[in-house]
């Protein structure tokens, strides 16, 4: 057989690995450890797509490489299985979300195993397993005990069609829900919150210690959004009311000409004049229909309504009209801003729209034309005139503190984490509300609080979850006879994914979240690979929970993930018409190398785009494995380009990778394998070992594969192959194409053992040096020949070789040699007359 028969070889080795538990996590205390973590998937109904294996293959290559280097490797997989899609499916079909989820997990696991990933399945976790979410609930009770989980009446993003509130991050820029594209409205509701803001400074500062890309760290820094400035208190004219504004530029207070409150601000109704009451009420209603993202869009038209009230500027006593506008959010800062239109573009546009005064207080611009947002010396600012920014801020803060109407303040953009969902398919929140007005956490001895099985999982419509309908589960009575009611909200999908990497370390422990010694052994995660779309939320939430557990003494490290790598996106093929509209692939035909719309006949432009069901351009890995084999898919996805680049899927590229594996198969099975080394491949082999080792370490898998191809080309030029080089090459390709490598290893090593723990090959530095070198031969100063000679020949040997060359002999025939100058490793110059 002269080709790689993947249909026979791949299932054979997958069966061997499963039977022998080949990838069971090493426990030899004398070995170093390596923890390679994938972002575990949500097991959807559609199964894996070819984007999933890209990151999984990367961590698998590293895991196989580290095992061969003598490491204990922890490489686990599990399921982020709670969440809206399963519940939505269950409501649409009448099926149990638990059954649907179990079927999906079985399908995902089948697909993953077909790709030959070296997971330790003994450590599999499932966030919907009560033995797992017992500890999710335990963490919540600890947060509650420490005052970091609390209830609050907060305006939430309510989605009527989903029957639940969603987090700000789940609202799209157009004001619809990320899940389903439904309208989102603002609605005040009782919600559970987690006080992530208590950790803001640590979450910010500890980023400096992490081996993450600067772009991801910057996204977290911006999300946390630390600002240093001052709180300034404004009194409302003619009342005993006052409100506080946070500003990073208190030095511009003399230029503040109006103030703006969020429509939801608690003062609005109290200070609104009777003349403005109707306009204010209408505006508040309109604002409630918009998401925070829509409201704060810088490009949108400025809207607002005057309340009829005035604030008093604390530094000059001037009256400032108080407006409400939807670009100010009650949940951000104090829900109030002081507007300095001369030096803030949004304030300037608002002032121009509503004909409000603009007073310049920093010199350097023309504030009639646009806001001047650069720094400058202060003007029109009384005792601040002539000062620079730093001096003016220090002076105004001192003044405000002396007057009792302001103080220095650090704030964060980060909001507390809205933690409750009004849905069924999630972890029950382990809290009981008693009729005497108190609330207590469910004792640890009663955890897990198991999610009750029910067929009626439709939202209650009252803002409570379907659990509110389950009276037997809901109502409890204390030993002293006091009646209570269980919390009906469930946790968000983020909960189980915030700590799953810890449970992999000790997944069957019934007494603790995980054993302290094992946590010390394995933490932090050495490399975490996943999509950049999780750059803020999941990673921030996981870091928050980890720091909390560190404070409890549960985990030994301050941070969970030492190195993070975001793989790029694998794009599908798409087609666009003349308007730029995307056309589904089943509406396209290819004729003479061009693409045409089947229905209209219009010629279409081919371009890469994100794979989607609507475009019918999703590639199923099952189809690829069936036709080309898992090893081909693995090699192709790693060879497409840099791991962090977004690259279009290509059938031609897939075929190229398959042909390469066939060449590898033929090289090892067809060449004569020798016990003696003739030295012909010394340089090529040692270069390949060095390059592949270094490129795997730096996650440059595409260039590692390119070097493997270089070796195959070199080896194919030789008649025979040295056995140690054949073995070493098979080891080098094993992390990329493990099934093929296992099969070839048996033909060369004949041990009957897996290649997985065979020591990684090393290179001989001395063999990397060129053993031949090109020299030039000059006659009367002109180059007449170039010769390949052994390195480091003596002057005499060089001269002898040059004079014996046929070309040189022809040039000097009949001439007298006056002198020969030889420079070793460089040239021979022959002087004749």
From Swiss-Prot:
GO molecular function: aminoacyl-tRNA deacylase activity; ATP binding; leucine-tRNA ligase activity
One term under GO cellular component: cytosol
Binding-site positions, ATP: 613
Keywords assigned by UniProt, alphabetized: Aminoacyl-tRNA synthetase, ATP-binding, Cytoplasm, Ligase, Nucleotide-binding, Protein biosynthesis
EC code: 6.1.1.4
Motif 'KMSKS' region: chain residues: 610-614
Cited InterPro entries: aa-tRNA-synth_Ia, Leu-tRNA-ligase, Leu_tRNA-synth_edit, M/V/L/I-tRNA-synth_anticd-bd, Methionyl/Leucyl_tRNA_Synth, Rossmann-like_a/b/a_fold, tRNAsynth_Ia_anticodon-bd, Val/Leu/Ile-tRNA-synth_edit
GO biological process: leucyl-tRNA aminoacylation
Ligase is among the record's keywords: yes
Span of the annotated motif 'HIGH' region: 41-52
EC category name: ligase
Catalysed reactions, as listed in the record: tRNA(Leu) + L-leucine + ATP = L-leucyl-tRNA(Leu) + AMP + diphosphate
Subcellular location: Cytoplasm
UniProt record similarity statement: Belongs to the class-I aminoacyl-tRNA synthetase family.
Protein name in UniProt: Leucine--tRNA ligase
Organism listed in the record: Streptococcus pneumoniae serotype 2 (strain D39 / NCTC 7466)
Gene name tied to this protein: leuS
């Amino acid at each position: 057989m002269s080709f790689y028969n993947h249909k026979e070889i791949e299932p054979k080795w997958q069966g061997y690995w499963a039977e022998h538990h080949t990838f069971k996590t090493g426990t030899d205390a004398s070995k170093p450890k390596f923890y390679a973590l994938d972002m575990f998937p949500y097991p959807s109904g559609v199964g894996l797509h070819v984007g999933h294996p890209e990151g999984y293959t990367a961590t698998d290559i590293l895991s196989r490489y580290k095992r061969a280097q003598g490491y204990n490797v922890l490489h686990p997989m599990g399921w982020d299985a709670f969440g809206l899609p399963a519940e939505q499916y269950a409501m649409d079909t009448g099926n149990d979300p638990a059954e649907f989820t179990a079927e999906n997990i079985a399908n995902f696991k089948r697909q993953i195993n077909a790709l030959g990933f070296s997971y330790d399945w003994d450590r599999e976790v499932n966030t919907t397993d009560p033995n797992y979410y017992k500890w999710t609930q335990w963490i919540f009770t600890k947060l509650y005990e420490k005052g970091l989980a609390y209830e609050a009446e907060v305006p939430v993003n309510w989605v009527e069609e989903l029957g639940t509130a969603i987090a700000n991050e789940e609202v799209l820029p157009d004001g619809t829900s990320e899940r389903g594209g439904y309208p989102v409205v603002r609605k005040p509701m009782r919600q559970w919150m987690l006080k992530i803001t208590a950790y803001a400074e640590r979450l910010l500062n500890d980023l400096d210690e992490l081996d993450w890309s600067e772009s991801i760290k910057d996204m977290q820094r911006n999300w946390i959004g630390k600002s240093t400035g001052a709180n300034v208190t404004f009194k409302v004219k003619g009342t005993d009311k006052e409100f506080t504004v946070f500003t990073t530029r208190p030095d511009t207070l003399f230029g503040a000409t109006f103030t703006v409150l969020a429509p939801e601000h608690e003062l609005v109704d109290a200070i609104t004049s009777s003349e403005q009451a109707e306009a204010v009420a209408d505006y508040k209603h309109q604002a409630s229909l918009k998401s925070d993202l829509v409201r704060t869009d810088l490009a949108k038209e400025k809207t607002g309504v005057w309340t009829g009230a005035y604030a008093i500027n604390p530094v000059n006593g001037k009256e400032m009209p108080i407006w409400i506008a939807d670009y100010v959010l009650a949940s951000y800062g104090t829900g109030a801003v002081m507007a300095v239109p001369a030096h803030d573009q949004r304030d300037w546009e608002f002032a121009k729209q509503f004909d409000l005064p603009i007073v310049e207080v920093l010199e350097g611009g023309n504030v009639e034309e646009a806001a001047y947002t650069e720094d400058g010396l202060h003007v029109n600012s009384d005792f601040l005139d002539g000062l620079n920014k730093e001096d003016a801020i220090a002076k105004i803060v001192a003044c405000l503190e002396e007057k009792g109407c302001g103080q220095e303040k650090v704030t964060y953009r980060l909001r507390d984490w809205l933690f409750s969902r009004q849905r069924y398919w999630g972890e029950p929140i382990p809290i009981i509300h008693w009729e005497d007005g108190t609330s207590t956490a469910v004792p640890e001895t009663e955890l897990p609080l198991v999610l009750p099985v029910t067929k009626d999982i439709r939202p209650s419509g009252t803002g409570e979850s379907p659990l509110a309908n389950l009276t037997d589960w809901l109502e409890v009575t204390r030993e002293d006879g006091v009646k209570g009611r269980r919390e009906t909200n469930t946790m968000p999908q983020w909960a189980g994914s915030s700590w799953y990497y810890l449970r992999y370390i000790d997944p069957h422990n019934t007494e603790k979240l995980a054993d302290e010694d094992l946590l010390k052994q394995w933490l932090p995660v050495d490399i975490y690979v996943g999509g950049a779309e999780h750059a803020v939320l999941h990673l921030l939430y996981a870091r928050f929970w980890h720091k909390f557990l560190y404070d409890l003494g549960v985990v030994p490290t301050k941070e969970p993930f030492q190195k993070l790598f975001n793989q790029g996106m694998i794009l599908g093929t798409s087609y666009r018409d003349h308007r730029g509209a995307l056309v589904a692939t089943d509406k396209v035909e290819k004729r003479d190398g061009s693409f045409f719309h089947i229905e209209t006949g219009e010629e279409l432009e081919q371009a890469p785009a994100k794979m989607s069901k609507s475009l019918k351009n999703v590639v199923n890995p099952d189809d690829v494995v069936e036709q080309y084999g898992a090893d081909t898919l693995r090699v192709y996805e790693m060879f497409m380009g840099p791991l962090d680049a977004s690259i279009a899927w290509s059938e031609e590229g897939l075929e190229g990778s398959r042909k390469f594996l066939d060449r590898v198969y033929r090289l090892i099975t067809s060449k004569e394998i020798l016990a003696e080394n003739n030295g012909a491949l010394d340089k090529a082999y040692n270069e390949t070992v060095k390059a592949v080792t270094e490129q795997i370490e730096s996650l440059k898998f595409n260039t590692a594969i390119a070097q493997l191809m270089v070796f195959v080309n070199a080896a194919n030029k030789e008649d025979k192959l040295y056995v140690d080089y054949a073995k070493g090459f098979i080891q080098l390709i094993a992390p990329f194409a493990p099934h093929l490598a296992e099969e070839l290893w048996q033909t060369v090593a004949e041990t009957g053992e897996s290649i997985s723990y065979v020591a990684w090959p090393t290179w001989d530095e001395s063999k990397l040096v060129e053993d031949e070198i090109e020299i030039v031969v000059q006659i009367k100063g002109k180059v007449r020949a170039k010769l390949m000679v052994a390195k480091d020949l003596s002057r005499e040997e060089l001269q002898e070789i040059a004079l014996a060359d046929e070309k040189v002999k022809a040039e000097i025939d009949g001439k007298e040699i006056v002198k020969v100058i030889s420079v070793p490793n460089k040239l021979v110059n022959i002087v004749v007359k």
